[in-house]
Amino acid sequence: MKIISDNKRGMHNYKVIDKYEAGISLMGWEVKSARANTVSLLNSYCFFRKGEIFLCNAQFKQYMLVKCDETRDRKLLMHKNEIVRLQSKLHKLGHATIIPSKIYFDNRSRIKIEIALVQGMKKTDKREEIKKRDNERYIKKVLKNVY
């Protein structure tokens, strides 16, 4: 699995509830752009339209002389029951959203995208998470020196 692009900044601001894998419908020049690692998932999100799920604001940089919309809406390929389950979880949670966490090549050289159902975190939650990580690092460091 070769990672094309990560959305670390986007994932930092949210608490991940669930993750899903989906295919993505791309044009030829977008695939070439992905192979050249010129994809940005910053400020991108997913939305539902007529029972289908779409990726919005993902930027595939222009490849060579092709003149097309770099941030067009791209259809995500998922099973119908997965889409329905994701939609119901989204409505059940209320203040939640779906953002892409990473885009990658799978073992068969297909471009896949990992999307995450997330809820926004407040500053206090972020601070608690940072403290928790620091404590875990400290404990690992102490245990490493003991053994």
Swiss-Prot record:
The lineage of its organism: Bacteria, Bacillati, Mycoplasmatota, Mycoplasmoidales, Metamycoplasmataceae. Keywords: Cytoplasm, RNA-binding. This is SsrA-binding protein. Belongs to the SmpB family. One of its GO terms (biological process) is trans-translation. InterPro entries: SmpB, SsrA-bd_prot, SsrA-bd_prot_CS. It comes from Mycoplasmopsis fermentans (strain ATCC 19989 / NBRC 14854 / NCTC 10117 / PG18). CDD domains: SmpB. One of its GO terms (cellular component) is cytosol. It is found in: Cytoplasm.
